[in-house]
């Protein structure tokens, strides 16, 4: 790879990896680039559809239809359509689309006193787009404040040194020669809530995880995926369940991903961040997925991890020379 085109919002980590490899940016989207990085957002599918690549080996950093995974409402709707609501709730926390009359009616019917929920705003990122509540009236008024999804808060999650946590994984989607494939990186993060959990599901500091540097983690809390695995009572069984759950989620969305592609001759990839929870009994659920995941490092360890993931990505798809075995492993995702 010699040149790439990217919008100003290009991930800084991606730009750093490419600069270190001697790959030059170009401001001309009509130039003979080797990689095109779109502006991720609501219109990126249209942007890709309007591309006119001059060569069939030009890569595109975006897969139209990936919103079926990264849009929180659409992910839940896709799971329900593929498996039914009860089975879908075994793969991801039960959710209600607050802008849909049918889901609002179901929420009113299913709500019980003492139930806890987390409201999600699709526009605001990280903790600013989240709100904890037990109040049905707050749930129903959610869309007025931009909250479009209510997700059941899971009470019986595994704790690490009394802290709730989730695992942050990195999933690579590739489409080449008509094949859509899914690859999971062997490295990841353990993201913990700042405060110990005392049982109060309305305590945001103890319930909502926050990605921080290793230097400010509470004593004993793991930073990386590999460190977190050592705390699991049956790590191999839990990791196998993780693969199974992730594959089933991807199975449900694969048909839409297949049909949405608009550049038949050009290869494409997309990196997603996947947030996962583990229950006290070892059950695994996918909380959400994020497109163009936030790769801003929080410390030197975080920088090294994210730098390697991005470098491995480009080596995996042969845009950069391979310097070590790939950090990505293929997931066996078939039609549901």
PLM regions and their residue ranges:
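Glycine-rich phosphate/pyrophosphate-binding beta-alpha loops
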Residues: 290-298
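Flexible, active-site-adjacent loop/turn segments at secondary-structure boundaries
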Residues: 67, 269-270, 293
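Conserved N-proximal alpha/beta basic substrate-recognition cap immediately N-terminal to
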Residues: 3-116, 123-125, 135
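Catalytic core of tubulin tyrosine ligase-like
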Residues: 99, 113-115, 122-271, 279-286, ...
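Intrinsic disorder
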Residues: 4-12, 27, 62-70, 75, ...
């Amino acid at each position: 790879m010699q040149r790439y085109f990217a919008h100003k919002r290009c991930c800084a980590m991606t730009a750093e990896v490419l600069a270190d490899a001697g790959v030059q940016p170009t401001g001309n989207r009509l130039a003979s680039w080797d990689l095109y990085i779109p502006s991720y957002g609501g219109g990126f599918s249209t942007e890709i559809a309007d591309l006119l690549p001059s060569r069939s080996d030009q890569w595109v950093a975006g897969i139209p239809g990936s919103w079926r995974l990264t849009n929180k409402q659409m992910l839940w709707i896709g799971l329900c359509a593929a498996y039914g609501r009860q089975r879908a709730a075994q793969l991801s926390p039960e959710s209600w689309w607050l802008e849909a009359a049918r889901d609002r009616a179901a929420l009113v019917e299913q709500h019980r006193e003492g139930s806890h929920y987390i409201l999600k705003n699709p526009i605001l990122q990280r903790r600013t787009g989240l709100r904890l509540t037990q109040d049905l009236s707050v749930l129903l008024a959610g869309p007025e404040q931009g909250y479009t999804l209510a997700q059941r808060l899971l009470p019986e999650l595994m704790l690490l040194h009394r802290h709730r946590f989730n695992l942050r994984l990195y999933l690579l989607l590739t489409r080449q020669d008509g094949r859509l494939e899914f690859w999971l990186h062997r490295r990841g993060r353990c993201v913990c809530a700042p405060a110990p959990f005392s049982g109060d599901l309305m305590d945001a500091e103890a319930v909502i995880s926050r990605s921080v540097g290793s230097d400010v983690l509470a004593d004993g809390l793991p930073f990386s995926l590999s460190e977190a695995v050592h705390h699991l009572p049956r790590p191999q069984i839990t990791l196998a369940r993780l693969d199974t759950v992730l594959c089933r989620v991807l199975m449900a969305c694969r048909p839409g991903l297949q049909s949405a592609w608009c550049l038949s001759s050009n290869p494409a990839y997309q990196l997603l961040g996947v947030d996962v929870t583990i229950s006290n009994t070892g059950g695994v659920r996918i909380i959400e997925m994020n497109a163009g995941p936030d790769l801003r490092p929080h410390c030197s360890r975080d920088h090294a991890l994210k730098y390697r993931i991005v470098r491995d990505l480009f080596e995996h798809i042969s845009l950069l020379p391979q310097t070590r075995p790939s950090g990505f492993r293929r997931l066996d995702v078939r039609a549901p």
